[in-house]
Amino acid sequence: MRAPASSAASNRPGPSNHPTPRWNSKQFFLTYPHCNLTPSELMKELFSRLTEKIPGYIKVSQEFHKDGDPHLHVLIQLNTKLCTRNPKFFDVQGFHPNIQPVRDAEKVFGYISKTNGDSDEMGELQLRIKKPEKPTRDQRMAMIIASSTNRNEYLSMVRKEFPFDWAIRLQQFEYSAAALFTEPPPVYQSPFPNEQIVCPPELVDIIDQEWNQVTTD
């Protein structure tokens, strides 16, 4: 009787399995250590190798270490993704680079632009447009408080900005509106017209007598 196949053997990938690509990106940061090629020579070699991927931008910068040893740094931006498992894809004339996919091209560009040697580039650098950060709920509420000038305006802005909260917390918003925008007390209005307020003659005589009375100590 044949022994059952082990679970390890059954989990081995068959010939139909596709290997995961080693590099799969549109942007690469390469560093060629101990490389005595000029930036122009390296750029031409890379451009010819990447032609079918339609290079959008390539920049090569030379850096000399304190001992005079030259390094070359490269930023590559492609219009289509490069997908390869070939570890020697970027090898040029026997020089093998350190390869890193790029997430932030602006940082890499800034780094290789500060080198102390020659540089060469082709194409137009493409930078990701950063979307402005949305204000938080607290910031939006603070803007409403700062910009509204009365209760009605405040409540109207809250209703527009926070419709769900308005529906379930209306009483709290009305309370905060009353606390933020206190109304001055109403001006007193007499129920009697001024022409109806007449001092009786008898009272006039009494007042005159009291005010005009002279006393001696």
Curated annotation (Swiss-Prot):
Gene3D superfamilies: 3.40.1310.20
Residue span of motif RCR-3: 111-114
Notes on the domains: There are 3 rolling circle replication (RCR) motifs. RCR-2 may be involved in metal coordination. RCR-3 is required for phosphodiester bond cleavage for initiation of RCR.
Function of the molecule: Implicated in enhancement of V-sense gene expression. Acts a an inhibitor of C-sense gene transcription.
GO cellular component terms given for this protein: host cell cytoplasm; host cell nucleus
EC primary class: hydrolase
Database matches in Pfam families: Gemini_AL1, Gemini_AL1_M
Annotated PROSITE patterns: CRESS_DNA_REP
Listed EC numbers: 3.1.21.-
Stretches assigned to the CRESS-DNA virus Rep endonuclease domain: 22-125
Compartments where found: Host nucleus; Host cytoplasm
Chain location of the short sequence motif RCR-1 per the record: 29-32
Subunit relationships: Homooligomer. Part of the C- and V-complexes which are RepA-Rep-DNA complexes involved in the c-sense and v-sense transcription.
Organism: Miscanthus streak virus (isolate 91) (MiSV)
GO biological process, one term: symbiont-mediated perturbation of host cell cycle G1/S transition checkpoint
Top-level taxon of the source organism: Viruses
Annotated spans, Oligomerization: 176-188
Keywords, ordered alphabetically: Activator, Covalent protein-DNA linkage, DNA replication, DNA-binding, Endonuclease, G1/S host cell cycle checkpoint dysregulation by virus, Host cytoplasm, Host nucleus, Host-virus interaction, Hydrolase, Metal-binding, Modulation of host cell cycle by virus, Nuclease, Nucleotide-binding, Nucleotidyltransferase, Repressor, Transferase
Disordered: annotated span: 1-22
Protein name: Replication-associated protein A
